Amino acid sequence: MKARHKRLGLIVAGLAALGLGAALVLSAFQKNLVFFFTPSQVAAGEAPRNRSFRVGGMVEVGSIERQADGVTVSFLVTDTAQRLRVNYRGSLPDLFKEGKGVVAQGKLTADQLFVADEVLAKHDENYMPPEAAYALKQAGAPALAGALK
């Protein structure tokens, strides 16, 4: 084999390895990508089925129900236009309260129940994830979204 053919073979093998590595990285990134949806988007059918995603909005006042086991909690997340029932089994953040911002990550069941694996509460009185503030503004609650930037 000539030296020129060896170099060409090494270049082709290197490019193939680089392409394979890039494909593996992109595949792993795609599997770990989690999208954010509002209750209105979930109600409109825009949220994926059988795939984890995040839903965010405000915890509806009077909607928190704690089960007898002391670990399971059910509550409504609203963007003022729609609301979504969320079930969570685990310890809630200290800042989790009615009327406050929340982001839950989990999956949607066939009967429109969101089963959360993780619940995140806003960390101070002035913070709201940009996606949630935008969603509230789009849902017709600009004063609420502006107050919670």
From Swiss-Prot:
Q: Which InterPro entries match?
A: CcmE, CcmE-like_sf, NA-bd_OB-fold
Q: Which residues bind heme?
A: H123, Y127
GO cellular component terms?
plasma membrane
The compartments listed are:
Cell inner membrane
* Periplasmic topology ranges: 29-149
Q: Which residues lie on this side of the membrane: Cytoplasmic?
A: 1-7
Does the record carry ATP-binding as a key word? no
Q: Which GO BP terms apply?
A: cytochrome complex assembly
GO molecular function annotations of the record: heme binding; metal ion binding
Membrane-spanning regions, if any? 8-28
* Membrane-protein topology: Single-pass type II membrane protein
Q: Does the keyword Transmembrane helix apply?
A: yes
Sorted keywords for this record are: Cell inner membrane, Cell membrane, Cytochrome c-type biogenesis, Heme, Iron, Membrane, Metal-binding, Signal-anchor, Transmembrane, Transmembrane helix
Where is this chain primarily localised?
membrane
On the tree of life, the source organism's domain of life is Bacteria
Cite the HAMAP family for this sequence. Answer: CcmE
Describe the function of this protein: Heme chaperone required for the biogenesis of c-type cytochromes. Transiently binds heme delivered by CcmC and transfers the heme to apo-cytochromes in a process facilitated by CcmF and CcmH.
NCBIfam families attached to this UniProt entry: PRK13254.1-1, PRK13254.1-3, PRK13254.1-5
Similarity field: Belongs to the CcmE/CycJ family.
* The protein's name: Cytochrome c-type biogenesis protein CcmE
Instruction: Tell me the name of the encoding gene.
Output: ccmE
